[in-house]
Amino acid sequence: MRNKGDFLFTSESVSEGHPDKVADRISDTVLDAYLAADGESRVACETLVTTNRVVLAGEVRGPSSVTPEALIEGARAAIRDIGYDQAGFSWKNAQIESYLHAQSADIAVGVDSAGEKDEGAGDQGIMFGFATRETETLMPAPLFYAHGILHRIRDLRKAGDARVAMLQPDAKSQVTLRYVDGRPVGATSVVISTQHDEGASQAAIREALRDVVQDVLPEGWMCPEDEFYANPTGVFVIGGPDGDCGLTGRKIIVDTYGGAAPHGGGAFSGKDPTKVDRSAAYACRYLAKNVVAAGLADRCTLQISYAIGVSHPLSVYVDLDGTGKDVDEAKLGSVLREVMNLTPRGIRQHLRLNRPIYTETSAYGHFGRTPDEARDNFTWEKTDLVDALRGAFNR
């Protein structure tokens, strides 16, 4: 997304009850179960969800205390927490099968370390991070508000608010914003599709959703009434995994920057932090956010690449999109290597990733979230490198 001129830009989000997000949630529940038992566990868990059936598959290495039965019960608890107790998909009677098996010894050889020697990356790949001064969380505005709308609906639904009592867990949102001189100034259209009880009034649903959107968007940003689309296809009773099959890792743009920045292609959920698809993408966001928070630029895109079995990144690329404040991008790339150890081990230690902190990342975006000091989560959203970055450029 460019940073100059007048244009429209759109991003979408999906709720925790979307089939693909149900799969992501279960995969991260499996991951957290292993990391809670042993922080050095290796996990690559894929999940398929469909009508009253859940299938777990992938590779793991961890303590035997994490039994298939425990993982199945964890998946069932996740479905219950999301809110599914429907004829076609219920936490009570969904058939859950686990086909998880041991991690490949060939992969383990390239990844494992000897003592304190840096281990190699779990795979080759490219990862991106991004930050922009458009919102208080330094996230792109269209995605920020698309997430915010669904998160607000979720909070109201789980709080038992009568206005949304007819709504069920599956939902999607899409927000189009108008930019003037490269800055967002208002919404031109908002789309929300949400699963609901049979017989629910579409007029009541529209009214409830309009109230949510107006609460989430800044004052004066609401789109014209004829560009507000609430359940535009009409009835949406059959939803969730009963309506569409869900798979882990199919919402990578929703998970990251809503299309406002490049994506390396690797999904996050179900992967332990030796997988640089996840951990290095978190590091890229962390560094990009700190660059913008330090006042070195208004926008920052960062790319890092790795090779399997090699500990150091093969490249670090920085693009400030013309918004740098007298900052040389090549020098900034070198400085970023200095302020953070970008080996897989270094990233995990710096961001404290070998902990069961992933379940809550599985919906409403991995980035732009608020760290909770008590739980020490979302560490990649902290801005604790600001002083070091300013010092490197004599600010």
From Swiss-Prot:
What residues bind L-methionine, as annotated? E59, Q103, D244, K275
What's noted on cofactor binding? Binds 2 divalent ions per subunit. Binds 1 potassium ion per subunit.
Q: Which CDD domains match?
A: S-AdoMet_synt
What are the alphabetically sorted keywords of the record?
A: ATP-binding, Cytoplasm, Magnesium, Metal-binding, Nucleotide-binding, One-carbon metabolism, Potassium, Transferase
Annotated region Flexible loop: where?
A: 103-113
Answer whether the UniProt record assigns the keyword Cytoplasm to this protein. Answer: yes
Please indicate which superkingdom the organism of origin belongs to.
Bacteria
- PROSITE patterns under this entry? ADOMET_SYNTHASE_1, ADOMET_SYNTHASE_2
Q: Where in the cell is the protein located? A: Cytoplasm
Name its co-factor(s). Mg(2+); K(+)
Xref: Pfam families = S-AdoMet_synt_C, S-AdoMet_synt_M, S-AdoMet_synt_N
Reaction catalyzed: L-methionine + ATP + H2O = S-adenosyl-L-methionine + phosphate + diphosphate
Q: In which pathway does it act?
A: Amino-acid biosynthesis; S-adenosyl-L-methionine biosynthesis; S-adenosyl-L-methionine from L-methionine: step 1/1
Give the residues the record marks as binding Mg(2+).
Answer: D20
The UniProt record lists the EC number as 2.5.1.6
Q: Where does K(+) bind?
A: E46
Where mainly found? cytoplasm
Residues bound to ATP are H18, D170, A171, K172, D244, R250, K251, A267, K271
Q: What does the subunit section of this Swiss-Prot or TrEMBL entry state?
A: Homotetramer; dimer of dimers.
Give the protein family. Belongs to the AdoMet synthase family.
Q: What does this protein do?
A: Catalyzes the formation of S-adenosylmethionine (AdoMet) from methionine and ATP. The overall synthetic reaction is composed of two sequential steps, AdoMet formation and the subsequent tripolyphosphate hydrolysis which occurs prior to release of AdoMet from the enzyme.
Q: What protein name does the entry list?
A: S-adenosylmethionine synthase
